[in-house]
């Protein structure tokens, strides 16, 4: 063994003892006679002192040490002289006086200093990820990720779940994001797909009698990236037989409660708040509302009917709505700043943005169209105070909700009104389908294997084929046995009770405009499995990366994934994806056409 213990495990009780340690040179300071080294490993830092009085040879050797050299040292632990203690270090009251030093490996000059990260670009950090990961902040993130994963595994094991691995090379059944395809050398012209989720296999495991399955599983989606998305990601995935939504909701709440308690020593409040999909959209303009602040969207259509403002009246007459939100603290905005806010709303799809400042009364070009009493009624409904601004969007209900929902987040960011803590919610009663204007057909709000609510099944089976292509048909009214879990404005996970009868599953496929031939080709194996005695079952998948991101307070998923991709799905460290040689392509019977 190179060492007796980790750096931060050294205790004051060991003063006077000989100790061997290993790690990286974090800092080196030459104070004339003495050389001080901050020795770092994954647990922390300890100060090592080289003195010519102890060993001239080791002292001279220490002169050559540079940042990130890997060394082994042996020495006597001493108490630091009074006044030189470092309260920021666990080991700040002691130091190791070295009598032996071995340089295990050298380091080139660093592209950036590990303790000065503010000015370092993310691209450079990702290129030298092995250096970036040495930083205490990153080490902390991944140790916490490990503890979260272990807490989840232990909890699910205690509840009778069985961990089963599902295939990484599977069939392409695209319904949503693009698949990552893998060509088959042994079956020329055919392709595997990397799984977007283990959906079909975990359902088949329920049909196989496993009753309770879980997996910490890698998933892959070829989609445009943003701060909370990666092409490969990890899910906490589980499925249960003979359950109702309430059973799964209770398991998830208990699991997360124990996870936060064990890992962060935080008591989250359970049961979580519950919202219907309609309520979430109407109040917050999003099906993943951030509940760290209030600012609910209000429908003021009935009130503004009593105004003389033609823009509002015309919108209502055409079947639209007028909705408003409190612009917290925005009454101080200049006209040019309001114009920028209007441009932002327009970038979200709004035709414009009406506003009224609440500042010792009401100020706006449009106040002349409202009576004083009406303005007070609107202000009361929207919940504004002196110093705030009322922001209005007049349009179709869906667009007004979306625009104000996005402005709501912008306002909260500007006003710095997000509360500290973890704010969970369940979103329930989703529509089973939504209309895709581009494809002119209904698509699944979640996925095609989500069960309709019991009271909607007969209605669903009686929907005639011509209604499948009518956005106003009764298809839009069918509700799903689905439940999404939201944390601080992030969709943490989604689940549902699944369809366990072949006839209902086939009917869903038809509503989704999937032909009989396509059903057989893409999902035939799955529909066949449903004909051999499938139990009622349901499950959920939670995004482990997102959970860790929120629990650590990280700004991006890239700070909690060891080797992430950029927003162009590129790995600066390995330079993947990369070209392959012609021999490999020929073996796969692939010819490029770029």
Curated annotation (Swiss-Prot):
Subcellular location: Cytoplasm
One Pfam short name: tRNA_anti-codon
Assigned keywords, A-Z: Aminoacyl-tRNA synthetase, ATP-binding, Cytoplasm, Ligase, Nucleotide-binding, Protein biosynthesis
Cellular component aspect of the GO annotation: cytoplasm
GO molecular function: aspartate-tRNA ligase activity; aspartate-tRNA(Asn) ligase activity; ATP binding; nucleic acid binding
Residues holding L-aspartate: 175, 221, 446, 498
Sequence positions that bind ATP: 221-223, 230, 491, 543-546
Known EC number: 6.1.1.23
Site location (Important for tRNA non-discrimination): 31, 83
GO BP annotation list: aspartyl-tRNA aminoacylation
Region (Aspartate): 199-202
InterPro entries the record matches: Aa-tRNA-synt_II, aa-tRNA-synth_II, aa-tRNA-synth_II/BPL/LPL, Asp-tRNA-ligase_1, Asp-tRNA-ligase_1_N, Asp/Asn-tRNA-synth_IIb, AspRS_core, GAD-like_sf
The UniProt record lists the keyword Iron: no
Catalytic activity: tRNA(Asx) + L-aspartate + ATP = L-aspartyl-tRNA(Asx) + AMP + diphosphate
Source domain of life: Bacteria
The family this protein is said to belong to: Belongs to the class-II aminoacyl-tRNA synthetase family. Type 1 subfamily.
Assembly description: Homodimer.
Function statement: Aspartyl-tRNA synthetase with relaxed tRNA specificity since it is able to aspartylate not only its cognate tRNA(Asp) but also tRNA(Asn). Reaction proceeds in two steps: L-aspartate is first activated by ATP to form Asp-AMP and then transferred to the acceptor end of tRNA(Asp/Asn).
Name of the protein in its database record: Aspartate--tRNA(Asp/Asn) ligase
